[in-house]
C-alpha cells in the first residue's frame, strides 16, 4: 500500500504577524501569532476528518508534527490521491484568499530507498508550490472584496474577526468567557473549538498580578518624581491583564535608567539539512517531537524563572518578556531590554544542554554533532516601535543591534553587542 507524507506550510507568516502599528501591538501581536497556529491545527483537523480518521490514537499516529506554521501528516491510498490533494488545496485557498496569508500543501510518495531522498523531494515540491500561492483561486484574485468587517457569512476577512476576538481574549482577564468570536475557519467555529480543546489555557504572556502591582505602587511612592517622558501604555494595569510594551520599557528604566524595548529572534541552523539526513520517518517524527517540546515546554519553564541582568538586578521574566512566536524551530520575543539580554543568555545555556542530549541519545543516529542556534537582538525606542512597515525596516528607532551567531557552539557564553544609533531610514 502506497504511503504519502503531506506537508502544510503557512506562507507569509512574518509579514502577517508584524504588520501592526505600535499602538495596539501588545494586544494584536500574540493574537496574530496564535492565528497562524490555529490555521495549521484546524487544517490538520479538516484533513483527518476528510479521510474519516476518527480514533484519537490513530489521529495522533498520522500527525508527525505541527508547529511553527508547518504540519506533516502520513496518509495512505486509497484515502489520498492527487485529485484529493487539489480539492483540499482549493478549499484552503478559498478560505484564506482574503486573509493576507496562505496555506501551501505539498506531498511526496514515500519510497523504499530511504527517507532522506523523500525529504529532499518534499522540500523541492514545497518550494515550487510557494511560487504560486492561491493558484486554485486565480479568477477570484481579481474580483472586488470588502475589508473583512462585513457581518455576512463566507470567507471574507476570517483573520480580522478571529484576531479581534483573540486580541481581547488573550490580553484581558476573563474576556474569553464573556464573548463569542463570530468567526469560523475551515468549517469550525473558532470560539467553540478553543473552548472544547482548552487551547487558550497555558498561553504565556506577561500579566499583572497582585505582587507586581504592589511593587509598582511601592516604587512610585519611593520615587515620586514625574516620568521623564510619556510612555506607550494601552492596557489597564489590572490583575490578569497583559503588561503592555510601555510598562515593560518602564520596568527596564527603573532597573537601568534606560527605557528601551529589546527584540530577540532565534532559529536553529540548517534544520532542513539535518532532517534530510534522517534514515526513517520514525526518527524524523521523534526529532520533530523533541524540538517542539523544547521550544514549547523548556521556554515556558525559562520564562517562569528569575535571573540577574547586566547590573545585578533580579528580573522576573514572567513580568518582563512577551513571547510573540514560539515555533517548531524558531522563536521571537519582545520585552524589557535588560530582560531580553538576560533571557538570551539563559536560552543559550538551555539549548546547549538540549543539543548535547540529542547527540548522546542513540535514538538519533543522524545527529552526530550538537545543533546550533543563530540569534539577533535589537534594542528600540518603545515610543516609536512601529511594526507595520511593509519593507521590513519598521518605523522604530534602532538604538543597538546585537549579533549572536552560532549560539550553541563553543564553550564561551557571550553576546557581542555592536553599539550605534540607526534610524529606520538607515537600515
Predicted regions span which residues?
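Regulatory and interdomain segments flanking nucleotide-handling catalytic cores
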Residues: 1-427
Amino acid at each position: 500500500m502506497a504511503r504519502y507524507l503531506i506537508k502544510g506550510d503557512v506562507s507569509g507568516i512574518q509579514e502577517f504577524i508584524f504588520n501592526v502599528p505600535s499602538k495596539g501591538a501588545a494586544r494584536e501581536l500574540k493574537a496574530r501569532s496564535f492565528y497562524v497556529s490555529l490555521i495549521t491545527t484546524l487544517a490538520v483537523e479538516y484533513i483527518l476528518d476528510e479521510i474519516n480518521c476518527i480514533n484519537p490514537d490513530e489521529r495522533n499516529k498520522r500527525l508527525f508534527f505541527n508547529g511553527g506554521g508547518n504540519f506533516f501528516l502520513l496518509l495512505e491510498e486509497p484515502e489520498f490521491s492527487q485529485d484529493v490533494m487539489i480539492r483540499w488545496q482549493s478549499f484552503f485557498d478559498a478560505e484564506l484568499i482574503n486573509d493576507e496569508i496562505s496555506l501551501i500543501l505539498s506531498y511526496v510518495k514515500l519510497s523504499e530507498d530511504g527517507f532522506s531522498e523523500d525529504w529532499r523531494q518534499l522540500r523541492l515540491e514545497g518550494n515550487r508550490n510557494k511560487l504560486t500561492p492561491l493558484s486554485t483561486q486565480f479568477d477570484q484574485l481579481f474580483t472586488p472584496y470588502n475589508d473583512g468587517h462585513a457581518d455576512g457569512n463566507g470567507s471574507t476577512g476570517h483573520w480580522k474577526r478571529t484576531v479581534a476576538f483573540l486580541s481581547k481574549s488573550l490580553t484581558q482577564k476573563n474576556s474569553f468567557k464573556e464573548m463569542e468570536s463570530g468567526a469560523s475557519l475551515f468549517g469550525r467555529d473558532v470560539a467553540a473549538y478553543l473552548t472544547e480543546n482548552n487551547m487558550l489555557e497555558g498561553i504565556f504572556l506577561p500579566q499583572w498580578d497582585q505582587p507586581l502591582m504592589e511593587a509598582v505602587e511601592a516604587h512610585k511612592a519611593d520615587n515620586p518624581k514625574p516620568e521623564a517622558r510619556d510612555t506607550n501604555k494601552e492596557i489597564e494595569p489590572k490583575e490578569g491583564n497583559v503588561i503592555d510594551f510601555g510598562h515593560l520599557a518602564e520596568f527596564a528604566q527603573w532597573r537601568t535608567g534606560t527605557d528601551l524595548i529589546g527584540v530577540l529572534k532565534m532559529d536553529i541552523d540548517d534544520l532542513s539539512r539535518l532532517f534530510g539526513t534522517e534514515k526513517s520517518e520514525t526518527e524524523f517524527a521523534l526529532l520533530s517531537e523533541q524540538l517542539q517540546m523544547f521550544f514549547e515546554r523548556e521556554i515556558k519553564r525559562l520564562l517562569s524563572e528569575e535571573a540577574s541582568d547586566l547590573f545585578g538586578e533580579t528580573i522576573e521574566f514572567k513580568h518582563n518578556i512577551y513571547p510573540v512566536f514560539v515555533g517548531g524551530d524558531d522563536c521571537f520575543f519582545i520585552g524589557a531590554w535588560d530582560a531580553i539580554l538576560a533571557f538570551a543568555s539563559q536560552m543559550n545555556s538551555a539549548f546547549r544542554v538540549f543539543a548535547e542530549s540529542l547527540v548522546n541519545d542513540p535514538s538519533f543516529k543522524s545527529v552526530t554533532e550538537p545543533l546550533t542556534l543563530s540569534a539577533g537582538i535589537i534594542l528600540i525606542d518603545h515610543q516609536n516601535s512601529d511594526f507595520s512597515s511593509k519593507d521590513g525596516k519598521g518605523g522604530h528607532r534602532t538604538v543597538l543591534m546585537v549579533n549572536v551567531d552560532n549560539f550553541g557552539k563553543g564553550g564561551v557564553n557571550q553576546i557581542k553587542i555592536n553599539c550605534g544609533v540607526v534610524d529606520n531610514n538607515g537600515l
